[in-house]
Amino acid sequence: MFLWLAHFSNWLTGLNIFQYTTFRAVMAALTALAFSLMFGPWTIRRLTALKCGQAVRTDGPQTHLVKNGTPTMGGSLILTAITVSTLLWGNWANPYIWILLGVLLATGALGFYDDWRKVVYKDPNGVSAKFKMVWQSSVAIIAGLALFYLAANSANNILIVPFFKQIALPLGVVGFLVLSYLTIVGTSNAVNLTDGLDGLATFPVVLVAAGLAIFAYASGHSQFAQYLQLPYVAGANEVVIFCTAMCGACLGFLWFNAYPAQVFMGDVGALALGAALGTVAVIVRQEFVLVIMGGLFVVEAVSVMLQVGWYKKTKKRIFLMAPIHHHYEQKGWKETQVVVRFWIITIVLVLIGLSTLKIR
C-alpha cells in the first residue's frame, strides 16, 4: 500500500524511497516483528481465556506432559502479522502477493479448524488425514495452476538442479503441477511435523524464508538473474516483501515460543508457514534448493515415514520415537539441546543452499 506514496515523489522527494524493494522489505520485517511483539501478550491472554490449551499426547515423551494446557493456535498471530505487513508494504498489483497470501490463509484455515477440534474435543489427532490431504491438495493445485499460467515464458516452467547449470528440464503443465503439489503439500506437512519442541520450527522457518528472499530478489531482477544464471521471474522481487514479513512475524512469535514456551503456533501456523515456503520456492523455481535449505523439515518428515513404514512391515521401530527430534530426547538430549543443535544445522544448510547461487 505504501508503494503508492512513491507516485507523489514529484511533490516530496523523500517519498521516492517507497519504490525500493530493499527498503520495503526491511520495513515489512520490522512491521511484522513489531506487530507480533505488540499483540503477542494479548493473544496469549485471549487464548488462555478461551481455554485453547494444547492437549499433549500421552504416548509422547513424558517430559512433555508439563506442557499440557499451554495455549496453542498462536500461529494465528503470525499469519495476521504477515498479512498486515505484506498488505502495507507490498505491491497490490503483483499477483504473486495474492497467491502467497491465499495459500497462507487457506492452509491456515485448515490448521485453525484442526486446532479447534483438538481444543474443543480434546482430541490430539484433530481432523482426519483424508480431510487434511484433500484440503491441502486443492490449495496446492489451484496455486500451481495460477503460477503456471502466470509464467511469462518457458524458462519459468523448468526444473532447475542445483550446482548443475546445464541441467534444466522442461516440465509442461502436468510436470509443473506435480512438482508444485509435492513442494507445497510436502513442505506444509514437514514443517508441521517439525513443530514439536519449543521454538524448533519457528527459527528454521525464519532462516529458510530469508534464504528464499535472496533468491526471489535475484530472480526478480533481469541483470542479477542473467549474471547468476537464474530464471528471470518478472515480479518476483515483490515476493521478497512476503518473505521478510514472514521472518519478522516468526521472530516476534519466537519471543513467546522460546523455551519454556508461553504459546504454541499449532497447526494454524505450521501448516500455513510450510505451504507458504513451498509456494515461494515454486515461484522462484528453486524447489531443490528448498530441499537443501529446509533439510531439517525433510529429515523430520522422512523419519516419520520410515518409522511408520518399517513398523507396519516388521513390527519394529527404527527410531526410539518419531519425528526424529523425539528420538534424540529419548536418547537423553535436553529439549533446548535438540532445538539449538537443529537450528545450527539449519544455518549450515541455508548457507549451502545460498552457495548454489555461484557454485554451478
Swiss-Prot record:
Chief place of localization: membrane
Pathway note: Cell wall biogenesis; peptidoglycan biosynthesis
Transmembrane regions: 24-44, 69-89, 92-112, 133-153, 158-178, 199-219, 239-259, 263-283, 288-308, 337-357
Reported cofactor(s): Mg(2+)
First-tier enzyme category under EC: transferase
Biological role: Catalyzes the initial step of the lipid cycle reactions in the biosynthesis of the cell wall peptidoglycan: transfers peptidoglycan precursor phospho-MurNAc-pentapeptide from UDP-MurNAc-pentapeptide onto the lipid carrier undecaprenyl phosphate, yielding undecaprenyl-pyrophosphoryl-MurNAc-pentapeptide, known as lipid I.
Protein name: Phospho-N-acetylmuramoyl-pentapeptide-transferase
